Amino acid sequence: MLEGAKSIGAGAATIASAGAAIGIGNVFSSLIHSVARNPSLAKQSFGYAILGFALTEAIASFAPMMAFLISSVFRSVSRVTI
């Protein structure tokens, strides 16, 4: 039962990567729209888009880290109690 809960928790933690992919798509979609509306601010908009991409990707990097922590912590706890 604990193994099943561990797998469900790790899977739920990695679903966040789908949300990050949607967020990155929104960042660059907004960049394309802003450059189409005002081409003179393309350089500044690109800098903001790269910052948004980096912050979104940083959040996405927490998902595999949490999945790893969930699987390793539950593995060590189950060994101690048995």
UniProtKB/Swiss-Prot annotation:
GO terms for cellular component: mitochondrial membrane; proton-transporting ATP synthase complex; proton-transporting two-sector ATPase complex, proton-transporting domain. The keyword Transmembrane helix applies. Keywords: ATP-binding, CF(0), Hydrogen ion transport, Ion transport, Lipid-binding, Membrane, Mitochondrion, Nucleotide-binding, Transmembrane, Transmembrane helix, Transport. The keyword Transmembrane helix applies. InterPro entries: ATP_synth_F0_csu, ATP_synth_F0_csu_DDCD_BS, ATP_synth_F0_csu_sf, ATPase_proteolipid_c-like_dom, F/V-ATP_Csub_sf. The chain crosses the membrane at residues 8-28, 45-67. The record marks E57 as: Reversibly protonated during proton transport. F-type ATPases have 2 components, CF(1) - the catalytic core - and CF(0) - the membrane proton channel. CF(1) has five subunits: alpha(3), beta(3), gamma(1), delta(1), epsilon(1). CF(0) has three main subunits: a, b and c. This is ATP synthase subunit 9, mitochondrial.
